[in-house]
């Protein structure tokens, strides 16, 4: 196989993976679970220090299996019931009795959560104490990327390179572009990419869950009621928005089902998957073509997001939906040029959407960007595109660089302001 394609598959396997619950509080649960394996006994006290961005994305979202919100319950649950071997599915087997144990620790004032100053966007340091014993685990640069382990002050493990880059480093040193992703998705042997179909299965189950039960703001179920009442129609646009939002409703509402995430985000994994799957159903394409489209969507999203920090004031659903729109054009039989038009159109439409933390209303943002993806792919098929206007360049690669520049140079103060507003 082409060595470059092997690198692309490695990237996908590394950052497109199942995640149970919003990944920021789950990072704390995972760190606690790893620390518990070091400590060897149930902790009497837990201390959690996190970056501002991780704090922001943990303030308003339910931790799966607990029915509760926030970093304190995530860390306590991880220490009591977490499976350190399960990664982002660390809390998959938690029981109501264990949730009660975790809550007892919190009620006794034994769980302390603090923000800490750090240059890292993803940072979580958990310390567990029991008597004279103490275990520390530090996560840095990625939701399950362990930088350091200590037992009673003595180093047990230190990563060779604990510091993450200021921007997503997943694509650093790799020859990758929208054109190469498009070619890879079209030409790579099907058996090498079949694994991506798991995204359709997992995120489809979340969508079904969100439609069946009243999670969060019930964005998906509200649209279903509107269809039943004859207020809106059940066309492709509304079906995509409804079912994509429903999956996010369930995820943000603490459903005990994993999402297939994209670069650490379950919602963005949903946005990269469900619109593509529903478009494939509409056009009645083969399973192989669906897999190729999902590869295009997920890897395209990863590539665009590698141009800016993993957590920021920018809502990543925008560029994820841009990649999904590119894949939707491919499914519909459009050209590479038209796929680029779709990316340009979505970014032009939705690039002003900010991230003000993970919470129930994320389902609305997912629905907004997914709606833009549908409009944009239809416009692209008609060869209508935004070009040379605002931050949208005449070339898609330049537009992607412009997004990175806007976020890195223009939105750092926005992020600080958002966190300040949320913390007062």
From Swiss-Prot:
InterPro entries named in the record: Ser_deHydtase-like_asu (IPR005130), UPF0597 (IPR021144)
GO biological process: L-cysteine catabolic process to pyruvate
Alphabetized GO MF terms: L-cysteine desulfhydrase activity
PANTHER family linked to this entry: UPF0597 PROTEIN YHAM
Family: Belongs to the UPF0597 family.
HAMAP family named among the record's database cross-references: UPF0597
Name this polypeptide is given: UPF0597 protein Sputcn32_1209
């Amino acid at each position: 196989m082409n060595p470059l394609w092997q690198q692309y598959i490695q990237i996908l396997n590394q950052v497109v993976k199942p995640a149970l619950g919003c990944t920021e509080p789950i990072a704390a649960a995972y760190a606690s679970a790893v620390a518990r394996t070091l400590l060897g006994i149930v902790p009497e006290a837990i201390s959690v220090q996190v970056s501002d961005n991780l704090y922001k994305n943990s303030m308003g979202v339910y931790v799966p299996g607990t029915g509760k919100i926030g970093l304190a319950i995530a860390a306590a649950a991880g220490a009591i019931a977490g499976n350190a071997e399960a990664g982002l599915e660390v809390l998959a087997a938690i029981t109501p009795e264990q949730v009660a144990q975790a809550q007892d620790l919190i009620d006794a004032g034994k769980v302390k959560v603090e923000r800490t100053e750090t240059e890292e966007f993803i940072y979580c340091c958990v310390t567990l104490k029991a008597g004279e014993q103490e275990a520390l685990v530090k996560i840095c640069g990625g939701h399950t990327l362990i930088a350091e382990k200590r037992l009673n002050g003595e180093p047990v493990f230190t990563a060779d390179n604990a510091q993450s880059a200021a921007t997503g480093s997943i694509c650093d040193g790799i020859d990758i572009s929208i054109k190469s992703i498009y070619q890879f998705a079209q030409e790579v042997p099907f058996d090498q990419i079949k694994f991506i179909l798991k995204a359709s299965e997992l995120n489809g189950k979340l969508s079904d869950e969100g439609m069946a039960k009243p999670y969060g703001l019930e964005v998906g179920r509200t649209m279903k009621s509107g269809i039943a009442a004859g207020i809106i129609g059940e066309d492709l646009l509304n079906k995509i928005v409804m079912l994509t939002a429903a999956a996010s409703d369930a995820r943000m509402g603490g459903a005990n089902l994993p999402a297939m995430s994209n670069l650490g985000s379950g919602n963005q994994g949903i946005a990269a998957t469900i619109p593509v799957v529903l478009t494939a159903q509409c056009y009645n394409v083969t399973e192989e073509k669906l897999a190729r489209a999902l590869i295009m969507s997920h890897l395209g999203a990863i590539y665009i997001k590698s141009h800016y920090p993993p957590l920021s004031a920018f809502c990543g659903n925008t560029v994820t939906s841009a990649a999904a729109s590119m894949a939707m054009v491919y499914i519909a039989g459009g050209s590479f040029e038209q796929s680029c038009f779709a990316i340009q159109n979505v970014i032009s439409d939705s690039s002003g959407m900010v991230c003000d933390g993970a919470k129930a209303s994320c389902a609305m943002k997912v629905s907004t960007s997914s709606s833009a993806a549908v409009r944009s792919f239809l416009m692209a098929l008609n060869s209508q595109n935004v070009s040379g206007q605002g931050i949208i360049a005449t070339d898609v690669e330049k537009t992607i660089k412009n997004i990175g520049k806007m976020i890195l140079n223009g939105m750092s103060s926005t992020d600080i302001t958002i966190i300040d507003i949320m913390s007062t």
